[in-house]
């Protein structure tokens, strides 16, 4: 069975991964938006 400590570690790792995924998405989206405006 999963202990409380294992569940806490898993949820923290998952939260950090999702946060970094959102930050990377916004970073990529902002850069592609600026470059597409400059080329038009």
Swiss-Prot record:
Pfam families: Ost4. One of its GO terms (biological process) is protein N-linked glycosylation. InterPro entries: Oligosaccaryltransferase, OST4, Ost4p_sf. It comes from the Eukaryota. It is found in: Endoplasmic reticulum membrane. Residues 1-4 are lumenal. The chain crosses the membrane at residues 5-25. Residues 26-40 are cytoplasmic. GO terms for cellular component: oligosaccharyltransferase complex. Keywords: Endoplasmic reticulum, Membrane, Signal-anchor, Transmembrane, Transmembrane helix. The keyword Membrane applies. It is a single-pass type III membrane protein. Subunit of the oligosaccharyl transferase (OST) complex that catalyzes the initial transfer of a defined glycan (Glc(3)Man(9)GlcNAc(2) in eukaryotes) from the lipid carrier dolichol-pyrophosphate to an asparagine residue within an Asn-X-Ser/Thr consensus motif in nascent polypeptide chains, the first step in protein N-glycosylation. N-glycosylation occurs cotranslationally and the complex associates with the Sec61 complex at the channel-forming translocon complex that mediates protein translocation across the endoplasmic reticulum (ER). All subunits are required for a maximal enzyme activity. Belongs to the OST4 family. Component of the oligosaccharyltransferase (OST) complex. This is Dolichyl-diphosphooligosaccharide--protein glycosyltransferase subunit 4. It comes from Drosophila virilis (Fruit fly). The lineage of its organism: Eukaryota, Metazoa, Ecdysozoa, Arthropoda, Hexapoda.
